[in-house]
Amino acid sequence: MPMITPDEIDFEKYERETDAKRKVKPASQWVQELIDRIKNPTYQPRSVMPWRKTHKLIQFRPGEVTVWGGANGNGKSLVTGQVALSMCGQDEKVCIASFEMKPSKTLERMARQWSTYNVSDPAFQGDERATAQFLDLYEQFRDWTDNKLWLYDQQGTVTASQVCAVVRYCAKEKGITQFFVDSLMKCVA
């Protein structure tokens, strides 16, 4: 699976791009888009969460930000991992920046969610047939995630400008459409 490591990329290039230069534009620039939407309504595909009862309530549109909040240890990483897998299944390209867990730990959890099996379950320990099935499942998972799922390999604190640079890099260079930051508390000034 492709990894994004901080040492391989000139993130300073992306940090030098100022928001003011790229983002401040006259409001009139968007009026024609509003007119076109009224004249020619189109369906915009949107990603949904993996739970059917949420499909009409919550959708993820391109260019928008979603913040997942909750107390420490309440399962935000677990839920967002499941949502990330669902988005991969909807042909989104996803990158996860987990500053609290190593990529292998994040991926181990996601592999359990994807396969619905826990390789650490004592019921499977010592069973050669189960081990062979797990190895096969992990190989399938590896192949399934290829060109769908990336992990940013950075633990500990990181600056907000570095996170923005990584997001821009992922969008421009990798075509990433969904970026998960876990956790914002690790982003410092």
Which residues are covered by each model-predicted region?
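Accessory, often N-terminal, substrate/partner-engagement and coupling regions
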Residues: 1-17
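Generic detection of intrinsically disordered/low-complexity segments and helix-coil linkers/edges
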Residues: 5-8, 24, 45, 128
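The Walker A/P-loop phosphate-binding site
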Residues: 14-117
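Cytosolic-facing regulatory segments adjacent to core modules
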Residues: 55-56, 89-175
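Structural motif
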Residues: 67, 151, 177-180
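Short glycine-centered, acidic/aromatic-flanked micro-motifs in structured strand/loop junctions
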Residues: 70, 153, 183
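Helical hairpin unit composed of two closely spaced alpha helices linked by a short loop
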Residues: 177-189
